Structures are given as C-alpha cells and as structure tokens.
Amino acid sequence: MKMKPPVEKNEYYDVTFEDLTHEGAGVAKVQGFPIFVPNALPEEKAQIKVTRVKKGFAFGRLIELKEESPHRTDAPCPIYKQCGGCQLQHMTYEGQLLFKQKQVKDVLERIGKLDLSKVTVHPTLGMEDPWNYRNKAQVPVGEREGGLVAGFYQQRSHDIIDMSACLIQQSKNDEAVQAVKDICANYGVKAYNEERHKGWLRHIMVRYGVVTGEMMIVFITRTSDFPHKAKIIEDITAQFPHVKSIVQNINPNKTNVIFGNETNVIWGEEYIYDLIGDVKFAISARSFYQVNPEQTKVLYDKALEYAELQGEETVIDAYCGIGTISLFLAKQAKKVYGVEIVPEAIEDAKRNAELNGNTNAEFAVGEAETVIPKWYEEGITADTLVVDPPRKGCDEALLRTIVEMKPKRVVYVSCNPGTLARDLRVLEDGGYVTREVQPVDMFPHTNHVECCVLIKLKE
C-alpha cells in the first residue's frame, strides 16, 4: 500500500529549518518528510506554504519568518529574489563560508566514504570584498514595450529581468552592457525573439582584464549582417577608450546554446590581456578564462603549495585548458606536460606559454585518458599529477591510469564537490590517501565552491 505524503499542496505549515541543500535551499521536515524552501536558513522557525509535492519530498515557499538565524542578512540586490544568478545573498558572508565547508565535508563522508578524522578539511578561503568580482558579463537581450532589455533570466524561466547593475559583476562590465544596449536601441537594432526565431541581437558579452583594464565587447547575433556597424563601433570606442576588441559571433540556430561556430573580429585586436599573479594571459571571445581572477590566484597558489615543487620534477596537468595552472607550475617545475580535449584551448595555452617566455611547458590536444597512457608508454611519467576536470569529474580511464602510473602526489582542483568525492574514493581504493582539502570561495553569494585537494601515494 502506497504511503500518502504527510503534507499537501497549497497547505500551510509551521516548521523549523534544520539544514541547507547543496543548492542553498532550506530543509525542514514534517513527520520526517523533507520540504525544500528557498531563502530559508538553518535554525529558523517559519510558516511555509507547500507549492509542490513529490513522492519523497516537497517544495515550499516562505510565508512568515518567526525566528531568524544569526546568519540572516538583507540581500542588497533589488532583484535578488527574481534573478537566478545568486542563491545566498540572504546569508552573511561568514555564514556562506561555513556552509561551503560543511557542504564539502558532507559529500566527502556521504559519497566518498572518507574518514574525516584522517583528512583535514580547512575553513573556506573567502574574499576580503566579496562583490563585483566577475570579469565577464554575458547577458541575453530582448524587447519590451518597443525598447531593448538586457539582463538575466528570471528563475526557472526565459523572461529577461532588465537590470542596470549586477552586484557580483565588475562595475565596468555593467556600464559597458548598458551603454551597448542604449547605443543599439538608438539605431533601432532588433533583439532576437526566441519563440519566433526572428530579430538580430541575441546576447551581449563583455570581457574585462581586471589588471590591464582592457575590454572586449562581443555581439552574439542571429545573422552575419551588422546594421549600422560603423556608427555603433564609433559610439562604443568614443565612450569606452579602453575597449581593445569588438567581436561578432554568429549563431543562426534555434537553440539555447549561446555561441555559434563563426566568430569574427570587427574592430581592434583578436585578444585582450590580463594577469593572474605575474602570469599573463591572452583572452579571445571564446577562451575559457576564470571569471574571478583574484580567487583563482588563491586557488592556484594552494595547488602550487600542495605540489611541493623543488625544480626537478615532471608534472602532468590533465584538463589544462588555456594553460592557467600549467604556467604557474612551469615556474617551479623542470617540465610540465598539459593535455586538453579542446583544440582552441591548446592553441591558447601555447600562445600563453610563449607570452610568458615558458620553454618547459608542452601541450597536446586529446582526451587526458588517451594521451597520458601514451605518454606513459613513451617513458613520460609524472612526479606530480594535477587534475582540474569539468563538473562531471575525471574520466574513469584517467583515474585507472593514475593508479597504474603511481605519481607520488596528485593535486585535484575541483569545481564540483560531489564528483570530487566520487573520484577520491576511486583513488583511495587504488592506493592513495587524501591528506588535505582546501575549499575556496570562487563565486561568493552563489552555492558553488571550488576545492584544492592534496592526495599522496600510500607509503
């Protein structure tokens, strides 16, 4: 006989919140049945309304707070509750850092089955000023009442919230997005309409070199024509003298994917430049480049510390991207080999190595799980292996290769604690031991957390 859930849709309940989900929603229970409620915090008492009931859990919304958490604060962003970009602005920054450390510990125990009495999970490294950190703004453009709107999508919808400023974006990016929107509106540019697949301007992207002050403007358009091109370029460059590059990307497809395959520089340079520490990077419209360079340096300094390089080591950097970690490692290692599946990223990595005068970094295109075993057969072995995989974590074949190669230490840089925990279990079963985990707050006010992990071969 099927058990009926103890809560009903549209009914009101008085609850106490016990925990947060990894997405940042409050968790309350009615007769042991979990209800997930956005904008609620542990230890808070509230009246909620149930909005959706599933077999094993329900969703609700906050109606009235009766007791507040000491970590509750007023979200400074006026559109925080509508916009889907941040999840934790209603929590003090100290509370966010504690939540992220706890999140990491939880998954290491639950998914990784690690004994945390033997692993040091450090307090989360946060920012002194956790606002205006993003160096890239990428906003959809739409039309409302005959004018252009540009902003972010409302939660769980494709309705654009027009906004003049985003508190986690570099303010220079906000200014540029607004100016480009106004300039385009001035010349009667038509925004792309997703439903009808008509109109021209789909997205505006702005990239900003925080150290160099250089800026790139990218127009993502449905067709390859560019109405009023000369005038629009003239207006942008007059208003923003630090713009070094204006680019058009053409995406003719009926899709949610932002970029199309064709990218053309329509004014200025192909690249802008920025520095992380003393390493210089060339950034194109499509380059993957960390959006918070200040915290990226914190993360990479920790990776260097865990690598313990003395100048005589060979290091392999799996998932090397445009060479960001590789070029930090190359300053202290004898030789660094980087591998990455995206050919354009490897071109960028080689360019960045040249830019920094690195002669001891070598890069190859391919799947890490294919290229690294080939290197192993050729006699290229690593004293230290660094992995910085995408959210899905390391490929199983790569983990098997690591276990076979037996590098003395592995430094794992992760953007997803769940897949990190899964992969650590595989490495532990293969003869490794997890020593230290350092959470880093790369994206304040969101539910994301990065980690740097020191893993050593058992002696």
From Swiss-Prot:
<feature type="binding site">
    <location>
        <position position="86"/>
    </location>
    <ligand>
        <name>[4Fe-4S] cluster</name>
    </ligand>
</feature>
<keyword id="KW-0004">4Fe-4S</keyword>
<feature type="binding site">
    <location>
        <position position="77"/>
    </location>
    <ligand>
        <name>[4Fe-4S] cluster</name>
    </ligand>
</feature>
<feature type="binding site">
    <location>
        <position position="83"/>
    </location>
    <ligand>
        <name>[4Fe-4S] cluster</name>
    </ligand>
</feature>
<keyword id="KW-0949">S-adenosyl-L-methionine</keyword>
<dbReference type="InterPro" id="IPR002792">
    <property type="entry name" value="TRAM_dom"/>
</dbReference>
<dbReference type="GO" id="GO:0051539">
    <property type="term" value="F:4 iron, 4 sulfur cluster binding"/>
</dbReference>
<protein>
    <recommendedName>
        <fullName>23S rRNA (uracil-C(5))-methyltransferase RlmCD</fullName>
        <ecNumber>2.1.1.189</ecNumber>
        <ecNumber>2.1.1.190</ecNumber>
    </recommendedName>
</protein>
<dbReference type="Pfam" id="PF01938">
    <property type="entry name" value="TRAM"/>
</dbReference>
<keyword id="KW-0408">Iron</keyword>
<feature type="binding site">
    <location>
        <position position="319"/>
    </location>
    <ligand>
        <name>S-adenosyl-L-methionine</name>
    </ligand>
</feature>
<dbReference type="InterPro" id="IPR030391">
    <property type="entry name" value="MeTrfase_TrmA_CS"/>
</dbReference>
<keyword id="KW-0808">Transferase</keyword>
<comment type="similarity">
    <text>Belongs to the class I-like SAM-binding methyltransferase superfamily. RNA M5U methyltransferase family.</text>
</comment>
<feature type="binding site">
    <location>
        <position position="388"/>
    </location>
    <ligand>
        <name>S-adenosyl-L-methionine</name>
    </ligand>
</feature>
<dbReference type="GO" id="GO:0070475">
    <property type="term" value="P:rRNA base methylation"/>
</dbReference>
<feature type="binding site">
    <location>
        <position position="290"/>
    </location>
    <ligand>
        <name>S-adenosyl-L-methionine</name>
    </ligand>
</feature>
<dbReference type="InterPro" id="IPR012340">
    <property type="entry name" value="NA-bd_OB-fold"/>
</dbReference>
<keyword id="KW-0479">Metal-binding</keyword>
<feature type="active site" description="Nucleophile">
    <location>
        <position position="415"/>
    </location>
</feature>
<dbReference type="InterPro" id="IPR030390">
    <property type="entry name" value="MeTrfase_TrmA_AS"/>
</dbReference>
<dbReference type="InterPro" id="IPR010280">
    <property type="entry name" value="U5_MeTrfase_fam"/>
</dbReference>
<dbReference type="GO" id="GO:0031167">
    <property type="term" value="P:rRNA methylation"/>
</dbReference>
<feature type="binding site">
    <location>
        <position position="166"/>
    </location>
    <ligand>
        <name>[4Fe-4S] cluster</name>
    </ligand>
</feature>
<dbReference type="Pfam" id="PF05958">
    <property type="entry name" value="tRNA_U5-meth_tr"/>
</dbReference>
<feature type="domain" description="TRAM">
    <location>
        <begin position="6"/>
        <end position="64"/>
    </location>
</feature>
<dbReference type="GO" id="GO:0046872">
    <property type="term" value="F:metal ion binding"/>
</dbReference>
<feature type="binding site">
    <location>
        <position position="340"/>
    </location>
    <ligand>
        <name>S-adenosyl-L-methionine</name>
    </ligand>
</feature>
<keyword id="KW-0411">Iron-sulfur</keyword>
<dbReference type="GO" id="GO:0070041">
    <property type="term" value="F:rRNA (uridine-C5-)-methyltransferase activity"/>
</dbReference>
<comment type="function">
    <text>Catalyzes the formation of 5-methyl-uridine at positions 747 (m5U747) and 1939 (m5U1939) in 23S rRNA.</text>
</comment>
<dbReference type="InterPro" id="IPR029063">
    <property type="entry name" value="SAM-dependent_MTases_sf"/>
</dbReference>
<keyword id="KW-0698">rRNA processing</keyword>
<keyword id="KW-0489">Methyltransferase</keyword>
